[in-house]
Amino acid sequence: GTTPFVLSILQHCKEAGIPTGCIVNNPHAPIALAADYPVEVITGPEFVTGSTRMKAGSSQKMILDMISTSLQIRQGRVEGNKMVNAKLINHKLIDRACRIFMERNPEYTDYEKVKQLILKAGSVKKAEDLLKSKSDLDI
């Protein structure tokens, strides 16, 4: 809550008219007072003094995860509890998209063909839309 370079950046942002936010774990921390949108998560003292990766760091990560998840939902990237418009930037996400597609569309059982469709379309939702618009696709 008192790191000088963070306080300096917050001040520069304020001078430039850039809105700022922060997540802090100490009530009324200077950083929270300097930010436009502070989030104070009072976790109390750490079990091991000086080890902020425990309660404080974990609580901040949870807050960031909640914000990120909420944004994904608001942007229409989630249907039910499935991420259907994720950017497929690695093998894990491609595999997950294939499994989600096959779960949502059980008539498609050939994993490799589903994978080709997912890669062509770019997401689960776009693959489903592509199938609806082109009934002659070989899948």
Feature annotation, model-predicted:
Residues G1-M62, S68-Q75:
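Glycine-rich phosphate-binding loops that contact phosphosugars or nucleotide phosphates
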Residues N105-I139:
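NTP-binding/hydrolysis catalytic cores, primarily Walker-type P-loop NTPases
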Residues D65, T69-N105, Y111, I118:
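Internal, active-site/partner-interface "lid" segment
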